[in-house]
Design a protein with these regions (language model features):
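Mid-chain, structured segments of secreted extracytoplasmic proteins
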Residues: 70-112
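Terminal, regulation- and interaction-focused segments at domain boundaries
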Residues: 25-66, 120, 141-211
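Bacterial N-terminal signal peptides
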Residues: 9-19
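Compact, glycine-rich, soluble single-domain proteins
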Residues: 74, 83-88, 203-216
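Hydrophobic alpha-helical segments and helix pairs
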Residues: 108-149
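A cross-kingdom marker for long, charged
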Residues: 209-305
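Sec/Tat signal peptide C-region and signal peptidase I cleavage site
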Residues: 20-24
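Bacterial N-terminal signal peptides that target proteins for export
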Residues: 1-10
Length: 305
């Protein structure tokens, strides 16, 4: 009898240990490939918009930063509510959906809400949003880096020693009030200061916070330049774009490129072809462009990648 009980306890312990190992082994990647097929960008975008609207998503903005791509930014009451409960949660108030033509193949993809929830240290997992996107658009696989990251690693991510974490943003400008900060950003983006223009704006309910998605076009800060060097794999990571500016209270912030790019391309090499070295000029140029877009002035920064 005692031996039988002991065997039962051992079996239960082994099963529990296996379950824990499976749970611990769950790995996340920044993007989800929804579908692939043939056709044209315009028709596919129209179809995707219809599916997203039927699933309850609101289109916050869209743009085509370079040929053969279209990017949609969607939000929902659930996303905005989750953003309101998290410090700097506005970064995740919109999820990005991309339609990319690579050769004869049209790829539909979107940001992985669960990955982004950890990347932006949200107080919500955004699993419901992930489920709704999957139901609306499909889910063939997560993708991005060759190897995924555990949730805790995403939440604490930085590319390497000396590079910024999520909670070390760039302060672009500061004003006397939230209303003034938002007004200046709107005006500066309309004037395309720094080569930046507005793609979308999402206001976070119940707090003085708004996130702006911006199209960057100037020199080394440009979307086309950066992606031309780092987005080279067969399945494109187009939904990395657009870059964000966050107005929170009286201040205007942006995530440093050394974090914002790396969190979506964590396995990008430091040197060689298709590496951070090829966009060495980008971090400072992006920060400068966003400072102008925030109504601020250029500051010198001695650091690059």
């Amino acid at each position: 009898m005692l031996i039988r009980k002991f065997r039962g306890v051992m079996l239960f312990s082994l099963l529990l240990g296996s379950a824990n190992l499976l749970h611990a082994a769950e790995l996340l990647k920044p993007f989800v490939l929804a579908s692939t097929g043939t056709g044209e960008i315009v028709a596919t975008v129209t179809e995707v918009k219809t599916k997203l609207a039927s699933a309850g998503f609101e289109l916050a903005g869209e743009y085509s930063p370079y040929d053969n791509v279209s990017i949609l930014i969607v939000t929902s009451d659930a996303l905005k509510a989750a953003a309101a409960k998290s410090d700097f949660g506005g970064y995740a108030a919109g999820q990005r959906v991309s339609v990319t033509k690579v050769g004869d193949e049209v790829q539909v993809a979107y940001t992985n809400p669960v990955y982004m929830a950890h990347a932006y240290r949200m107080n919500a997992k955004l699993q419901t949003t992930a489920d709704k996107l999957k139901a609306a658009l499909g889910s063939m696989k997560q993708y991005g880096p060759a190897e995924g990251l555990e949730a805790d690693a995403v939440r604490k991510y930085h590319y390497m020693f000396g590079m910024e974490y999520f909670d070390e943003p760039s302060l672009l400008a500061e004003y006397k009030s939230y209303d003034e900060a938002v007004a200046v950003v709107e005006k500066s983006l309309a004037a395309k200061k720094g080569g930046a223009s507005k793609v979308y704006r999402i206001d976070v309910p119940g707090k003085d916070e708004a996130v702006f998605g911006v199209h960057l076009t100037k020199d080394c800060s440009g979307d086309k330049f950066v992606m031309g060097h780092i987005d080279f794999k067969p399945v494109r990571s187009t939904a990395h774009l657009p870059y964000e500016m966050l107005v929170s209270g009286k201040k205007v912030y942006a995530l440093y490129a050394r974090f914002r790019i790396a969190i979506n391309f964590p396995d990008l090499k430091m040197m060689g072809d298709n590496s951070f070295f090829k966009i060495m000029c980008a971090p400072d140029e992006i920060e400068e462009a966003l400072m102008f877009a925030a109504g601020g002035k250029k500051v010198e920064d001695e650091d690059d990648f």
